[in-house]
């Protein structure tokens, strides 16, 4: 478990105090995939680097598995960092070292294992990330996705409890991003690792995360289960991320619907309700007619969800709306 208690970080630049992270409290439960999303300058990288103490907090307390890591001395910090792996946006591989040597680097530096043990561990890691046949290659001979898989193998070398991902997919194409996210999900599931990732892409959060924190200007403005935050955003920053992911311009959509008759509502379904024949049932029971103006069905990690924008006319609308609510469908009246 990772806990932040009123943690903040301020940099001094040209004699001025510049806050990168305002006083922040959060909790990441063990075994979770926890996402932090924000635009450039939001403070997410600072928050991530505070977890493994690459940055020293200006105040507050950081507790990991019951240990106050803000109070560790140099030896304690070195021991703690062996429990935290990290992968980076631009891979940070040594160009003059082979794939196997890059993965072995943390083990070699730790000095706790024989050469034979290191070789065995490296072979295990390369098999896990699907690169057993690339052990003797150099980074220049690899694709971007393969380089990131080497980075993941290296981060797992010391058998960490926590894996930090700093924009790990932002330099990759969509197909490669999907394969890397699938690998991270497998690692989380099979090794019970706690994963904290930062990104500016809502789709990354939607695919792999259990919980999400949305950051803006050094502040966590919204936090919760991904489905709750993604489907029912409360803060303007969160709503912008959701609209960017959906590729929806609400002003344009309102203009498109201006000529449509009736009440316009947006329904959000989750889980089994996504596939239930609710619209037909409600129409028969209440006598309303409906037109589908927009819609999508997708998944948030393992949970299916659907969103429909409807124009409803005729019949008993109040009864129809009550029926939607009774079926645990979130309804938003747009007009």
Swiss-Prot record:
The gene is metN1. Residues 2-242 form the ABC transporter domain. SMART domains: AAA (SM00382), NIL (SM00930). It is found in: Cell inner membrane. PANTHER family: AMINO ACID IMPORT ATP-BINDING PROTEIN, METHIONINE IMPORT ATP-BINDING PROTEIN METN. This is Methionine import ATP-binding protein MetN 1. It is a peripheral membrane protein. It holds the Pfam family ABC_tran. It comes from Pseudomonas savastanoi pv. phaseolicola (strain 1448A / Race 6).
